[in-house]
Amino acid sequence: MFGQFLNIIVRSIKLDKTLYKDKANYLESGFYYSLIIVVITIVIQTIPNNVYLSWMSEKGLWQGQEPLNFRNLLFLSLLIWFIKSIFIFLIGVKVFPNKNTKCNFLKVLTTVGFAHSPLIFNFLIFNDSLLYGILLIYVWYVSALVVGINEILNYENKLKSFLISFIAPMVISLSLFILFVQISI
């Protein structure tokens, strides 16, 4: 069981597209594995978040605001995982499906969870001089998401998968930014 979990993480990190074709990964245990991967990456994400906040404070860009406590960060991150999966499901399955697309929401949710595996390497960002590594890890995450979405939605090219995978976080981030700006006004 733990071996299967590690196998999923390693195959996702290696961008192995056969991970997403294996029906055994989409059973009930697959959903729980993806949930555990997301929670682990959220816990690890606190390291670069703290480094980023201290860097922003040194530059004078973060003044007086308190960072999110862990419970709120966990809840918000799980909510964003769910919203991102809904967005990818609606756009990829309902709006722009391929003729061979036969996918349910749970499969998309599980795939997005598996794609979070490269974010485990965020623990390496422990110093502000390493902050640019977040970009590399994020590109790796988007690549894993593109491979997964391309396989489960049976797209012929990866451009469609990239647009769906990359636009979802951008729309969510922009929406949250607008929401927080309106709340602070």
Regions inferred by a protein language model and the residue ranges of each:
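Selected alpha-helical membrane-embedding segments in polytopic membrane proteins
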Residues: 1-103
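Hydrophobic alpha-helical transmembrane segments and adjacent short intramembrane/lumenal linkers
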Residues: 89-176
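Juxtamembrane boundary at the C-terminal end of a transmembrane helix
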Residues: 173-185
